[in-house]
Curated annotation (Swiss-Prot):
Bias-annotated ranges (Basic and acidic residues): 230-239
InterPro entries with a match to the protein in the record: DUF4641
Organism: Bos taurus
Keyword Membrane carried by entry: no
In-chain residues carrying the UniProt-annotated modification Phosphoserine: S87, S123
Low complexity bias spans: 145-161
Pfam families to which the protein is assigned, alphabetical: DUF4641
Composition-biased stretches (Pro residues): 35-45
Record protein name field: Uncharacterized protein CXorf49 homolog
Length: 534
């Protein structure tokens, strides 16, 4: 056969009634070998092997009309049914006439199998339908070479020959005949070549030799594993899982792959993941529950009971669910257990006196400065005179009474024995010193506290002070037992500032005590602010 010859090999069931099995036709050009008879050559209106084709690469009915005329005039004989060399058939020529209906049926069947990739529900009796090799595998183009086309045809015949009706390979790939299966007859194409443009350039014979014509994939409906039938080693094909079976078809286009393996893969993967998750998550929930219960149980103030409950929950694997009322009780206990030691640790007591009972933040009044001094009786750092600051009007009366008694005592025991001078200095000493010496102290209760301090401290040193004050400010005559002038002297002293007050030694001591009180007040305010934050 010359290089310009083109041939078309067609396989399919029911190609003729004379042979009783699959037949094939050979179409040749003007130089193709023919049987006995005249060789009229190509007709003017007859299309060549590449002419008259549609977009799909298949000849149209008009082209086949002309080809039928060529065959009737002495065209090629059928493969497999022609006479062997030396037989009488070679001499007489065996011509088969194909009707237009049979050619159209063949073309429709081949187009359905090759282009659309229809999946068929096949029974063991109709397995030959899936083994039909498409026409496009060996279809020739106008510029193709005869040798390349012949190689393609031989490869197609060699691979399609073993697969025959009634002889399914190895039986394993077809599964149980009684079981309904899905058979996908898919074509494996190279990854870089699409099926539509595979044979656009048929000059290279490597493409034809590398192409495997067919792969039959059967996916059982009952959820079994997919079995692949390879044309090379059908009996040695191992059983693959759905995922591996999918990986063994890397070159099949997405349109050719059936949806059955994807569904099976998704279902099996989902079931496998669920099974693994069930196996792996049998123990973690128990552990998580025990950990959560341990954390929740560590909040109450009884760690032993919480630890026992946590170990019991971990051993049994059941998470006890406390009622809302029990949760509230536990929260209250946890708040109480945390706040009591925290106060003792965070704010240690100062001074010598330590209270045994913990401080309650709710009992602290808002900061006003002076009311906080009322709690200073529990601490030794606060002077003893400040204890009287929390008393009401009765405390003030007692302070005034002490001042009057001190004035009377100094008047009786004075060196001068002059009752006219003594009451006035004593009243001035007891009542007037806090006003100039404490300019920033409130004029309420602190003044009474300082009065009591002055009265207690001046009782031993009343004689020299009384003498000095007596010499500076003499007063008019008055009865020694009369104590009324002591009540009016603070008002008079506010108007008349006595001289030499800046050089008094007692002012330094009083100022020092005032500074100490201010420091204590600041510390108390700081602590009260912290308690309020907590």
């Amino acid at each position: 056969m010359s290089s310009s010859d083109d041939e078309v090999l067609v396989w399919g069931p029911g190609f003729g009634s004379e042979c009783g099995e699959q037949t094939s036709g050979l179409e040749a050009g003007s130089t193709a070998p023919r049987g006995p008879g005249p060789d009229p050559g190509p007709e003017p209106g007859a299309p060549q092997s590449g002419e008259g084709e549609g977009g799909d690469g298949f000849p149209d009915p008009e082209g086949f009309e002309s080809e039928r005329e060529v065959l009737e005039a002495g065209g090629p004989v059928l493969l497999g049914c022609e006479g062997r060399p030396g037989s009488p058939a070679d001499d007489t020529g065996y011509v088969v006439q194909l009707s237009d209906e049979s050619v159209a049926a063949i073309l429709r069947q081949l187009a359905d199998l090759d282009l659309l990739g229809i999946r068929r529900h096949m029974s063991p009796e109709s397995h030959g339908v899936g083994d039909v090799s498409p026409l496009r595998d060996v279809e020739a183009r106008p510029g193709s070479r005869g040798a390349a086309a012949q190689r393609c045809g031989e490869a197609a015949r060699a691979e399609a020959g073993p697969r025959w009706v009634g002889r399914p390979r190895a039986g394993r790939a077809w599964g149980n005949p009684k079981r309904s299966t899905n058979v996908a007859v898919d074509r494996q194409w190279p990854p870089s070549v699409s099926p539509a443009r595979l044979f656009s350039d048929s000059e290279s014979s490597d493409e034809c030799s590398e192409i495997q014509p067919m792969r039959v994939s059967i996916y059982p409906k009952d959820g079994g594993q997919a079995k692949l039938n390879s044309p090379k080693d059908p009996r040695d094909t191992p059983r693959h899982s759905n995922v591996q079976g999918r990986e063994t078809l890397p070159n099949v286009p997405g349109t050719c792959l059936s949806s059955a393996p994807r569904g099976l893969i998704s279902v099996v993967e989902r079931q496998g993941k669920q099974g693994d998750a069930e196996q792996e998550t049998i123990s973690p929930p128990k552990k998580i529950q025990s950990v959560l219960w341990g954390k929740g149980g560590s909040l109450p103030s009884f760690p032993g009971v919480a630890a026992a409950a946590a170990t019991a929950a971990a051993a049994t694997g059941r998470l006890p669910r406390p009622s809302p009322r029990r949760k509230r009780v536990q929260e209250k206990k946890s708040l109480g257990g945390v706040s009591k030691p925290a106060l003792g640790r965070t704010f240690p007591s100062w001074g010598r006196g330590i209270s045994a009972t913990p401080l309650d933040p709710a009992t602290f009044p808002p900061i006003s400065g002076i009311p906080l001094l009322g709690r200073s009786q529990k601490y030794a750092s606060v002077p003893w005179g400040a204890k009287e600051s929390k008393h009401t009007g009765a405390g003030k009366k007692s302070v005034a009474r002490r001042a009057r008694e001190l004035v009377a005592a100094t008047a009786v025991s004075g060196e001068d024995n002059d009752p006219n001078r003594d009451p006035v200095p004593k009243g001035q000493l007891a009542t007037d010193r806090p006003w100039p010496s404490c300019p920033r102290v409130h004029h309420g209760e602190p003044s009474t506290a300082n009065l009591s301090i002055r009265g207690g401290q001046d009782s031993g040193n009343s004689k020299p002070v009384a003498m000095n004050k007596g010499e500076v400010m003499p007063r008019g005559p008055g009865p020694s037992g009369d104590q009324k002038p002591a009540d009016h002297h603070p008002r008079l002293k506010r108007r008349q500032q006595p001289p030499r007050r800046q050089g008094c030694p007692r002012c330094l001591v009083l100022q020092k005590e005032i500074d100490d009180l201010k420091e204590q007040l600041a510390s108390m305010q700081y602590l009260a602010e912290k308690f309020r934050i907590l």
